[in-house]
Swiss-Prot record:
Main location: secreted
Annotated InterPro entries: AB_hydrolase_fold, AB_hydrolase_lip/est, Fungal_lipase-type
Alphabetical GO biological process terms: cell wall macromolecule catabolic process; lipid metabolic process; pectin catabolic process; xylan catabolic process
Source organism per UniProt: Aspergillus tubingensis
E.C. number(s) listed in UniProt: 3.1.1.73
Source species taxonomy: Eukaryota, Fungi, Dikarya, Ascomycota, Pezizomycotina
Active site: 154, 214, 267
Single GO cellular component term: extracellular region
Enzyme class: hydrolase
Name of the featured protein: Feruloyl esterase A
Length: 280
């Protein structure tokens, strides 16, 4: 699988014309460490949360046998946050959800006007919605001054986005971190931009991370009505804070411009961590 180096990435951005002004190279070490931490949790979700940071307390499991959606409620007292994480695709049942591209109204959140989302992931969401909302509320009741964080990779990233959107109707202290997230429709993307102040990297509470030529952020196809939000954090190899690009504006300037298709090496590995391998 072809690797995209920082040198190559700079060439892509410079030759993209209008994309140059909307892309900057390098993020702070603090933000980079935070992205790596959330990627660690998201990748560990494929293997029963192996090797997660020692400060994190593993709480209740989220699970539905019909959709095989898996997730956990975690807590980190050192950072005073309640973390919800979803596993990505891990079974044939999940694959059936992945391939249901039909745009479906996001009916569980009426405030999201005209929002439509990936049909399979919506089925996954409604199968665990009651569990998620109940478990989060239990934690908030016990720790009312804790912030809420939601994260996931691939299918788990889409579930994380739907969860964060739903919780935004009740709570206002949410941060969302996704890795290799597929698209929803433009109305949903706009809602997320507004709800999470994601029109600018200076204000965003929604960190959509991509890697090299990961093919999953290209799906479902834009010509079928799917879209991403404004801000993207694009990691290229060798991964580092300096080799992370902040991309705004036209979504086809960074990861999506690399022509990746479907599940490839760049999708399964983020910041050197491969889904479920737990070798970090």
């Amino acid at each position: 699988m072809k690797q995209f180096s920082a040198k190559y990435a700079i060439a892509v951005v410079v030759t993209a014309g209008h994309a140059l002004a909307a892309s900057t190279q390098g993020i702070s070490e603090d933000l980079y460490s935070r992205l790596v931490e959330m990627a660690t949790i998201s990748q560990a979700a494929y293997a029963d949360l192996c090797n997660i940071p020692s400060t994190i307390i593993k709480g209740e499991k989220i699970y539905n046998s019909q959709t095989d959606i898996n997730g956990w409620i975690l807590r980190d007292d050192s950072s005073k946050e309640i973390i919800t994480v979803f596993r990505g695709t891990g079974s044939d049942t999940n694959l059936q959800l992945d391939t249901n591209y039909t745009l479906t109204p996001f009916d569980t959140l009426p405030q999201c006007n005209s929002c439509e989302v990936h049909g399979g992931y919506y089925i996954g969401w409604i199968s665990v919605q009651d569990q998620v909302e109940s478990l989060v509320q239990q934690q908030v009741s016990q720790f009312p001054d804790y912030a809420l964080t939601v994260t996931g990779h691939s299918l788990g990233a889409s579930l994380a986005a739907l969860t964060a959107a739903q919780l935004s109707a009740t709570y206002d202290n949410i941060r969302l971190y996704t890795f290799g997230e597929p698209r929803s429709n433009q109305a949903f993307a706009s809602y997320m931009n507004d709800a999470f102040q994601a029109s600018s990297p200076d204000t965003t509470q929604y960190f959509r991370v991509t890697h090299a030529n990961d093919g999953i952020p290209n799906l479902p196809p834009a010509d079928e009505g799917y879209a991403h939000g404004v801000v993207e954090y694009w990691s290229v190899d060798p991964y580092s804070a300096q080799n992370t690009f902040v991309c705004t504006g036209d979504e086809v300037q960074c990861c999506e411009a690399q022509g990746g298709q479907g599940v490839n090496n760049a999708h399964t590995t983020y910041f050197g961590m491969t889904s479920g391998h737990c070798t970090w």
